[in-house]
Amino acid sequence: MAATQEDVKLLGIVGSPFVCRVQIALKLKGVEYKFLEENLGNKSDLLLKYNPVHKKVPVFVHNEQPIAESLVIVEYIDETWKNNPILPSDPYQRALARFWSKFIDDKIVGAVSKSVFTVDEKEREKNVEETYEALQFLENELKDKKFFGGEEFGLVDIAAVFIAFWIPIFQEIAGLQLFTSEKFPILYKWSQEFLNHPFVHEVLPPRDPLFAYFKARYESLSASK
C-alpha cells in the first residue's frame, strides 16, 4: 500500500537506539512519515494518548492506529509493506530472528548500560562480564555471514544497531573495552558493514552531540560518588 506523510507518524527522540530501529525499517521500506520529536521530561498529550501504558518512545502511528515497542513496530512495518523483507519467510528462521532480537534487549542493552552508568564497581564488573558473554553468543551466531539476515540485513541486524553504534560511544566515555575488533572480530566487521549501509547510515543520529550528552550524564554520575 502507498503511504503518505499524512498517515504515518513516528513519535521519538533523536539519539534513541529504539527509535533508530524503526527509522531503519522505514528507510528500508521507503515509507514516508512524519517525525514528531518528544521531550521525555515533558511528555506530550499525544504520547500519553498513543502510549498510555508505558508512556515512552518509540510510538508508530499508522492511520491513527498506535503501536509501541520497537521490535513490535519493526515487525508491523515488515508485514504492512512487503518490499525488502526484514524477517525470513521460513518459519524456523523467523523464530530464530525473533529469539536473537529479544536476546539483544534482554542480555545486552541492560548489561551495557549498567556497565557504564553505575558507581558500584562490583556491579560494573559483573555487567561487563555479562556483556562479553552475550556478545560472544552473537559472534558465534554470525559466523561467516555478511549480516545476521544473510546477504541482506534483517530483524536481528536492526535490533543490534545498539551494539554497532551506541556501545562504541559508551565504552569511549567510560574507558571500557566492551566491543573491540580484537575481542569480537566477526561482530566488529559486521558492525562496520552495517553502519555503512546507506539505509542505516542515513538515519543514524549525529555522533558528536550524542557523545556529549552521554559524557555529561556519565560525569554527573561519577561526581556523585
Swiss-Prot record:
- List residues of the GST C-terminal domain: 90-214
* Top-level division of the source organism's lineage: Eukaryota
Residue spans making up a coiled coil are none
The UniProt record lists the EC number as 2.5.1.18
Q: Does the keyword Endoplasmic reticulum apply?
A: no
The record's listing under InterPro entries reads: Glutathione-S-Trfase_C-like, Glutathione-S-Trfase_C_sf, Glutathione_S-Trfase_N, GST_C, GST_C_Tau, Omega/Tau-like, Thioredoxin-like_sf
Q: Which GO terms describe its molecular function?
A: glutathione transferase activity
Q: Read off the PROSITE patterns from this record.
A: GST_CTER, GST_NTER
* Record-linked Pfam families: GST_C (PF00043), GST_N (PF02798)
User: What triggers expression?
Assistant: By heat shock and auxin; by heavy metals like cadmium, silver and copper.
The keyword Nucleus belongs to this UniProt entry's keyword annotation: no
Top enzyme category: transferase
**What reaction does this catalyse?**
RX + glutathione = an S-substituted glutathione + a halide anion + H(+)
Span of domain GST N-terminal: 6-85
Q: Which family does it belong to?
A: Belongs to the GST superfamily. HSP26 family.
- Name this polypeptide is given: Probable glutathione S-transferase
